[in-house]
């Protein structure tokens, strides 16, 4: 099973393979073999699976047994989502206890919503899920897939940097998606944010620095750092240690992206300090094969006095293949120039 650099593909389907009792070889690329998997590996091995690594390959076999499972909540919510998908298929009832701090809780809530929509029964008591076995998921004949707040955030942040503003449609106001919090952060920055039932419009206001807790919204930090770089005063981004475990070390790659465009930013152990300026200079950004860094750099072009060139534009295909086409449709002139991996900048 080819995973590419997709952590969610690996972490979701590894326990599902164990629930089905099938032998699977997962093929990983990029930084995925280095991203943390040990807590999930240990739990799966303790409940009947056999796991063997061979470079970028992970060989999995065996069948998961019902029982008491426990996973940390402060490494990756994808561990928990993957097990919640797998446990209903086991032969008997299981429990899953989330230990330690819980980060990215919104993604787990989305998993619960999807499972219940599919007819799966589970109970949650504080930090423990009770999941009956012998269940089969069955989606309704028709169901509506929500708009993606994580990808919409780039355009909403462009709106916060533009007096004209940007309107995004198809976003569920009552969504469980954690990255819906982008609106709250933009309001705190001072942006003009207006919502209807499924439409959001964001325009520039008198932007000022804020403090951002990265723990529940790690994927928003690159693009929110761009807004911080164009806001008055300092912005402190805290509790961001997990960003070092993404497709790139996102603390360092976010800082490198901002510096390449003329921003003032400092990296400390688990966060960033960004000092805003009225404009950025523009320049060339190497996103380090990280889709969110590339899209954040394109967002920054809204506040630059010269063009932004983004190398390796294809890295955005991982999460948003139409990003550059949608950006071109939105702007009268290209907001950022892009190059393929084998092209010069």
Enumerate the language-model features and the residues they cover.
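Short, structured segments at the rim of ligand-binding sites
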Residues: 1-345
């Amino acid at each position: 099973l080819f995973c590419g650099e997709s952590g969610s593909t690996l972490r979701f389907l590894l326990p599902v393979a164990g629930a089905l009792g099938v032998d699977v070889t997962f093929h990983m690329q990029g930084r995925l073999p280095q991203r943390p998997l040990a807590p999930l590996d240990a739990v799966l091995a303790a409940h009947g699976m056999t796991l063997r690594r061979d470079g970028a390959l992970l060989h999995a076999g065996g069948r998961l047994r019902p029982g008491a499972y426990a996973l940390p909540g402060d490494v990756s919510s994808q561990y928990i989502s993957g097990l919640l998908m797998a446990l209903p298929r086991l032969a008997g009832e299981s429990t899953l206890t989330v230990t330690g701090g819980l980060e990215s809780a919104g993604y787990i809530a989305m998993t619960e919503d999807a499972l219940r929509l599919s007819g799966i029964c589970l109970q949650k008591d504080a930090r423990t899920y009770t999941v009956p076995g012998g269940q089969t998921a069955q989606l309704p004949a028709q169901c509506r897939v929500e708009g993606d707040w994580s990808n919409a955030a780039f355009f909403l942040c462009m709106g916060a940097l533009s007096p004209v503003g940007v309107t995004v449609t198809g976003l569920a106001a009552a969504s469980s998606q954690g990255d819906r919090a982008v609106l709250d952060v933009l309001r705190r920055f001072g942006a003009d944010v207006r919502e209807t039932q499924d439409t959001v419009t964001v325009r520039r206001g008198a932007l000022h620095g804020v403090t951002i807790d990265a723990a529940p919204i790690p994927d928003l930090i690159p693009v929110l750092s761009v807004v911080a770089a164009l806001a008055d005063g300092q912005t402190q981004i805290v509790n961001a240690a997990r960003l070092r475990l993404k497709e790139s070390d996102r603390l360092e790659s976010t800082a490198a992206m901002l510096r390449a465009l003329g921003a003032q930013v400092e990296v400390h152990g688990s966060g960033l300090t960004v000092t805003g300026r009225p404009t950025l200079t523009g320049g060339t950004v190497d996103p380090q094969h990280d889709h969110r860094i590339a899209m954040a750099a394109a967002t920054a072009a809204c506040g630059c006095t010269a063009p932004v060139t983004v190398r390796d534009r294809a890295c955005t295909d991982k999460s948003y293949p139409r990003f550059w086409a949608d950006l071109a449709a939105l702007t009268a002139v290209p907001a950022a120039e892009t190059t393929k991996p084998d092209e010069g900048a």
